[in-house]
Amino acid sequence: LLSNHPNACLTCRKSGDCELQALSAKLGVSNNLEFAGPLSQENKEYRFGAILRNPSKCILCNRCTAFCEEIQGIGAISATQRGFATVISEGHKCVNCGQCIQVCPTGALMQYEDAPDIEKKLTDPETFCIVQTAPAVRVSIGEGFGMEPGTDVTGKMITALRYMGFDRVFDTNFSADLTIMEEAHELVDRLQAGGKLPMITSCCPGWIKYLETHHPDMLDLPSSCKSPQEM
């Protein structure tokens, strides 16, 4: 696997969290192999929606295809072609759940990041930068810094964002309350008027895309309310 893998660990975003890299270090295998194998001709990173793909870093473990098919029940991606030319197909029925990224052991599937663009904006004195955080972030981001799961780091998070250069930090909690109230009113209206039930939340774009792609007959069930971020 390593002999056919690009020697780009120093510039790969997955470096430090790559299972192939960790396994190579554990077994004492060097990237400077005496007998290097052929590299994939698909050595090009490109964006597919919110996903960055680089087929040359794929080790064809098929975790992504198995998870998509067996766990998510979507089956949007699969292995195509044969032999060394085998690649994982693009997910034309993809619902943007992101689980393929989570299970990918290398840098073949990564989430697209706007960090470089944000850094430019933060250093531009003419740009007034605003950040808005979802309620879940305050109790989940701490895990990435070695804290216990569920630790509330609201104060630390706001301080860090201000130090980064954001001029204002807003909380989505207020609009989340608005969403709940609007959805409650809509549910009461549906119950009284004999509308379509059950009423399903419309806050998650991945969920709505799943309905549009796989269950278009259920598009009259989601609430008409916008997500807290949109409100």
Outline where the language-model segments fall:
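Fe-S ferredoxin-like electron-transfer domains
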Residues: L1-N96, Q102, T106-F128
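Iron-sulfur-associated redox domains of electron-transfer enzymes in respiratory
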Residues: Q111-M231
